[in-house]
């Protein structure tokens, strides 16, 4: 789960911006009512419902119902050239560890935001809040 409450608040704010109504968090995710999360969300905590749940159980249920489950990985398929569904669930990884092997096994499609850096010594990865914004923007652009 997301460890930094500020990142969770940013994700809630971005979700609100893109019209996402529900966020599902694993039990080890930062607390939505942490003051840092509340501040970073800029009020989005009152518009985006946050559910703390057992993610593997939830993902299994959603997959059985036919809902696509996307995961974000450094080695996934390029989000700009991959076919995307108009509905589904997007799993964002933990800041330090990414998505766990257990959750990875439940994702139907692995996505990545490609780097356009000029050299190999550039930034290794994106902040999870920034990555969430880019991912949601691309999904919404294609709708």
Name each model feature, range by range:
Residues 70-123:
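Active-site/ligand-binding-proximal alpha/beta "capping" segment
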Residues 17, 32-43, 101-143:
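Structured adenosyl-cofactor binding patch, chiefly the S-adenosyl-L-methionine
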Residues 4, 12, 46, 74, ...:
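Short, flexible micro-motifs
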Residues 1-75:
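RNA substrate-binding interface of SAM-dependent RNA methyltransferases
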Residues 8, 42-43, 70, 92, ...:
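Short glycine-rich loop/turn motifs that provide flexible caps or phosphate-binding loops at active sites
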Residues 66, 87-94, 132-142:
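Short flexible/disordered coil segments
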């Amino acid at each position: 789960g997301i460890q930094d409450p500020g990142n969770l608040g940013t994700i809630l704010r971005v979700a609100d911006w893109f019209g996402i109504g529900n966020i599902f968090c694993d039990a080890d995710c930062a607390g939505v009512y942490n003051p840092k999360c509340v501040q970073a969300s800029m009020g989005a905590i009152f518009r985006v419902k946050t559910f703390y749940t057992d993610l593997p159980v939830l993902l299994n249920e959603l997959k059985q119902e036919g809902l696509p489950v996307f995961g974000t990985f450094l080695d996934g398929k390029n989000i700009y050239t991959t076919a995307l569904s108009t509905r589904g669930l997007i799993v964002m990884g933990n800041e330090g560890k990414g998505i766990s092997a257990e959750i990875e096994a439940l994702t139907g499609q692995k996505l990545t935001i490609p780097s356009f850096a000029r050299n190999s010594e550039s930034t290794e990865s994106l902040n999870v809040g920034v990555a969430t914004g880019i991912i949601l923007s691309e999904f919404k652009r294609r709708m």
